[in-house]
């Protein structure tokens, strides 16, 4: 798998410095024995990996020690429930502290309200993803810079 992926990326001339592959928490567990060697091989070659949907309740914290990831993406349900569930901010802070101990960046998903940005930053979140910043769009549209989705969400 690792050799196939390297050839695919090389064939398209993509810059690895601008690419970070996501491993979903669920898929990492389902195919761990297959995924781990491939991820380790690619990470040794400088590839970036993010553990996606972390905190969804599927993986143990041990996967942060086993998988050579550089980024942890906090499951969006924790962000969605940030203001209504008092435990969500506590879990986010704990995940941020754990990631910091490993030297990992933390991304919060599903950020749909810009008012959450200061609170998430105070808990240790490095980056956010969601409609608060930008609506999804096709790569070709983003590259052209003239997509109707280019405007931040209201």
Regions found by a protein language model. Give the residues of each.
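Conserved functional hotspot residues or short segments at active or partner-binding sites
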Residues: 38
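Short helix-capping segments at alpha-helix termini
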Residues: 11-16, 42-45
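EAL-family c-di-GMP phosphodiesterase catalytic domain
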Residues: 18-32, 45-154
């Amino acid at each position: 798998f690792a050799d196939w992926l390297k050839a695919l990326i090389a064939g398209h001339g993509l810059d690895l410095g601008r690419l970070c592959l996501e491993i979903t928490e669920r898929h990492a567990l389902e195919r761990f024995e297959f995924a781990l060697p491939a991820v380790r091989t690619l990470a040794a070659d400088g590839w970036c990996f993010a553990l996606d949907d972390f905190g969804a309740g599927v993986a143990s914290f041990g996967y942060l020690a086993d998988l050579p990831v550089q980024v942890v993406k906090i499951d969006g349900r924790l962000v969605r429930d940030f203001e209504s569930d008092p435990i969500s901010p506590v879990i986010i802070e704990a995940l941020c502290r754990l990631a910091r101990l490993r030297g990992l960046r933390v991304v919060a998903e599903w950020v749909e309200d810009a008012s959450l940005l200061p609170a998430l930053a105070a808990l240790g979140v490095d980056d956010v993803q969601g409609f608060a910043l930008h609506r999804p769009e096709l790569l070709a549209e983003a590259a052209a810079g003239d997509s109707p989705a280019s405007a931040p969400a209201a």
